[in-house]
C-alpha cells in the first residue's frame, strides 16, 4: 500500500528542476543597471543600452576591454579541465600567476604567498584594475538584488516588528480595561503610546491666567540715571540756603535786629558787620523789611 502519491513527487521534482534552471539564467548587465531583466543569451544586438554613457554601463564596457587585453597579452596555457556528471567543474586560478603563465589554484593561495604580488608590469596592473572593477560591480549587483527583492535592513525590520508588538499590547490593554472596568486596571493615559502622532502633534498649552497675572505685575528694574553736572545756579542756590540758615540761627525773630555773635571779639567786628549786612539783604530780597 502506497502512502504517498508518486505523481505529486514527480511534479515536485520537475518544479525543483525548473526552478534550478531559472536560477541559472544570466541577464544583461546593462539592462540590469536600468531595472530591466533581459536574458543575456542572444540579447547583445538588440540591447537598447548598448551605448549608454552612464557610470554603471561604463564599468561593464571597461571590464570587457580589460578581459580582451588580458586574453591577448597573457601567456596562454591549457589547464586540465575537470568534469562532473558531464559538466565542467569551475576551478579558478590566481589571475596574477596566470598572466605570467603559472597555473596556481586560487583556493588557499593568499596574496602574501603569490610570487607576483609586488609585480608592477602591464599585465599585473590590468589584473589589479579588473579586480577593483569587479568588486565595484559585485557591490552594485547586490544592492540591485536587494532593491528587486524588496528587502529591508534587519535593524528596520526588528524595530518595525517591535513597534507592532507594542501597538498590539496597547490595543489589548485598552480592550481589557473596557470589558473589566475595575479601578485596579491602568488608566488609558498610562497605556497610550507616547509616540503616537496625535500626542506628538498636539498644540502647546495656553498659559494660565494666574501666571499671566504674575507676569504683568512684575516689578520693573530700577533705572540708573547719569549724574547731573553741578551748574552755577545750583551752587548759588545752595549758598543762599546755607546763609539763610545761619541768619535764622543768629536772629530768631524777624522784627528783631540781628545781634552780634557772642563769641566775636572787638577785633572781629567786621565779620559781624558782614553778617548784619547779609541779614538786611535777606530781609530786603524777601520783602520782610519795612
Swiss-Prot record:
GO terms for cellular component: nucleus. InterPro entries: DM_DNA-bd, DM_DNA-bd_sf, DMRT. It comes from the Eukaryota. One of its GO terms (biological process) is negative regulation of transcription by RNA polymerase II. SMART domains: DM. GO terms for molecular function: DNA-binding transcription factor activity, RNA polymerase II-specific; metal ion binding; RNA polymerase II cis-regulatory region sequence-specific DNA binding; RNA polymerase II transcription regulatory region sequence-specific DNA binding. It is found in: Nucleus. Induction: Negatively regulated by lin-41 which causes degradation of the mRNA encoding this protein. Gene3D superfamilies: DM DNA-binding domain. Keywords: Developmental protein, Differentiation, DNA-binding, Metal-binding, Nucleus, Repeat, Sexual differentiation, Zinc. Its main location: nucleus. Residues 28-74, 94-142 bind DNA. Residues 182-202 have a biased composition (Low complexity). Residues 146-155 have a biased composition (Basic and acidic residues). Residues 139-167, 179-202 are annotated as: Disordered. The keyword ATP-binding does not apply. Expression is undetectable in hermaphrodites, but persists in males. In males, expressed in cells of the tail tip. Transcription factor which binds the DNA motif 5'-[CGA][TCA][TA]ACAATGT[AT][TGA]C-3', probably as a monomer. Acts partially redundantly with the transcription factor dmd-3 to coordinate tail tip cell fusion and retraction and thereby regulate male tail tip morphogenesis. Promotes male-specific development of two tissues, the peripheral nervous system and the intestine. In the peripheral nervous system, directs differentiation of sensory ray neuroblasts into peripheral sense organs. In the intestine, causes repression of vitellogenin gene transcription. This is Protein male abnormal 3. The lineage of its organism: Eukaryota, Metazoa, Ecdysozoa, Nematoda, Chromadorea.
Amino acid at each position: 500500500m502506497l502512502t504517498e502519491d508518486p505523481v505529486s513527487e514527480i511534479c515536485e521534482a520537475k518544479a525543483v528542476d525548473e526552478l534550478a534552471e531559472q536560477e541559472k539564467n544570466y541577464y544583461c548587465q546593462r539592462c540590469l543597471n536600468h531595472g530591466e531583466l533581459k536574458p543575456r543569451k542572444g540579447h547583445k544586438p538588440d540591447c537598447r543600452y548598448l551605448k549608454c554613457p552612464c557610470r554603471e554601463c561604463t564599468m561593464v564596457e571597461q571590464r570587457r576591454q580589460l578581459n580582451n587585453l588580458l586574453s591577448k597579452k597573457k601567456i596562454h596555457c591549457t589547464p586540465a579541465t575537470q568534469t562532473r556528471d558531464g559538466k565542467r567543474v569551475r576551478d579558478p586560478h590566481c589571475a596574477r600567476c596566470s598572466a605570467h603563465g603559472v597555473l596556481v589554484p586560487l583556493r588557499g593561495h593568499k596574496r602574501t604567498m603569490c610570487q607576483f604580488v609586488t609585480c608592477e608590469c602591464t599585465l599585473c596592473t590590468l589584473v589589479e584594475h579588473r579586480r577593483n572593477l569587479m568588486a565595484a560591480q559585485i557591490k552594485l549587483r547586490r544592492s540591485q538584488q536587494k532593491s528587486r527583492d524588496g528587502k529591508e535592513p534587519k535593524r528596520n525590520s526588528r524595530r518595525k516588528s517591535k513597534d507592532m508588538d507594542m501597538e498590539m499590547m496597547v490595543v489589548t490593554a485598552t480592550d481589557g480595561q473596557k470589558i473589566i472596568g475595575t479601578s485596579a486596571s491602568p488608566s488609558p493615559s498610562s497605556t497610550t503610546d507616547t509616540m503616537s502622532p496625535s500626542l506628538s502633534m498636539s498644540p502647546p498649552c495656553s498659559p494660565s491666567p494666574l501666571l499671566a497675572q504674575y507676569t504683568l505685575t512684575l516689578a520693573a528694574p530700577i533705572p540708573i540715571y547719569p549724574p547731573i553736572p553741578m551748574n552755577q545756579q545750583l551752587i548759588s542756590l545752595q549758598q543762599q540756603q546755607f546763609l539763610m540758615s545761619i541768619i535764622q540761627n543768629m536772629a530768631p525773630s524777624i522784627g528783631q535786629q540781628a545781634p552780634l555773635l557772642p563769641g566775636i571779639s572787638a577785633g572781629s567786628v567786621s565779620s559781624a558787620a558782614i553778617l548784619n549786612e547779609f541779614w538786611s539783604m535777606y530781609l530786603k530780597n524777601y520783602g520782610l523789611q519795612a
